[in-house]
Swiss-Prot record:
This is Ribonuclease HIII. The lineage of its organism: Bacteria, Bacillati, Bacillota, Bacilli, Bacillales. It comes from Exiguobacterium sibiricum (strain DSM 17290 / CCUG 55495 / CIP 109462 / JCM 13490 / 255-15). Residues 87-302 form the RNase H type-2 domain. Keywords: Cytoplasm, Endonuclease, Hydrolase, Magnesium, Metal-binding, Nuclease. SUPFAM superfamilies: Ribonuclease H-like.
Length: 306
């Protein structure tokens, strides 16, 4: 099925709407009009973009303007096929690896090529450029329009596993599990899977050496993958939203606003919790092998001095 996207003036948008009014159907989120004919689906988004999909998409779209140039971003290594940004892709990303408090979260999300424009309309982009309130809003919208699978490794399990394996291996196991879960739910396999690279490909699969069901078909790895395909950006936003929800719950449990990251503010809060609840409870809420533990212990000792 062909897809053409035009950026049209308000006047041209109204022309499209007028031409397709008798074929009108209920529009998707962030769209003000949609129509379906035998050969083409037309969607007019609030942003002014108009998407034509179907066998007659190009023939119909050319009546109204020239298509927006499609993004074909690839890493410098050239390891991804041409036009990859417009494929139907499962993206996978993780959140929480560098945070002392809170779990490790991995999300695998599928964006069909027919939904790429819709996902962009929802505001999906590199999550580092999105505020926490917006993350929550976009994640709610994504929940309604794309399939995804998530895995949460809570701190008690994280600390237990960390005694015998690296964080990298834990992360790889979570990615593989989320990918397996999502793939079993899809009606047809994606054109590709893109993992935001946290380890070299050989190292990633070495981490999975003991796993029976290793996802290997059409799997690509790239750093800064959020900027390469919107599926990874969507996965990252969903993972962050889940992580934020977990942190909210942790704040309620402790009666303290729990900060993200692993900086000096984290040390101060950890020291306070250590004094109030003791080391066993602190271990339930943190990645205990981080250097923050020793720093919090030192701060707690200073505060306890007469």
């Amino acid at each position: 099925m062909g897809t053409v996207v035009l950026k049209l003036t308000k006047e041209k948008q109204e022309t499209v709407i007028s031409d397709f009014t008798r074929h009108q159907v209920s529009p998707p989120p962030y769209a003000r009009f949609a129509a379906r004919t035998a050969g083409c689906i037309v969607t007019v988004y609030n942003s002014g973009k108009v998407m034509f999909q179907g066998q007659e998409a190009e023939t119909v779209a050319v009546r109204y303007g020239s298509p927006i140039a499609k993004k074909t971003v690839s890493p410098a290594s050239g390891s991804l096929p041409e036009g990859f940004a417009n494929w139907s892709v499962v993206g996978s990303d993780e959140v929480g690896k560098g945070d002392f408090f809170g779990p490790l979260v991995v999300v695998a999300a599928y964006v069909d090529k027919t939904k790429i424009e819709l996902v962009r309309e929802l505001g999906v982009r590199d999550s580092k450029n999105v505020s926490d309130p917006e993350i929550r809003t976009i994640a709610r919208d994504l929940h309604a329009v794309i399939p995804y699978e998530y895995r949460i490794l809570h701190n008690p399990d994280y600390n237990r596993m960390q005694r015998t394996m690296t964080q990298g291996k834990m992360t790889a196991l979570l990615h593989n599990s989320a990918l397996n879960g999502l793939l079993t739910r899809l009606d047809e396999p994606p054109q590709a899977i893109l993992i935001d690279q946290f380890a070299e490909k050989a190292v990633y699969y070495k981490h999975l050496s003991g796993e029976t069901n290793q996802v290997k078909d059409n799997v690509y790895f790239s750093t800064k993958a959020e900027g390469i395909h919107v599926a990874v950006a969507a996965a990252s936003i969903l993972a962050r939203a889940i992580f934020l929800k977990e942190m909210d719950q942790l704040s309620r449990q402790t009666g303290t606003e729990i900060p993200k990251g692993a900086g000096a503010k984290v040390d101060q809060v950890a020291a306070s919790l250590l004094l109030r609840y003791g080391p066993e409870r602190l271990q339930e809420w943190t990645k205990y092998h981080f250097a923050n533990t020793k720093k919090a212990e030192a701060l707690a000792k200073k505060r306890n001095r007469p």
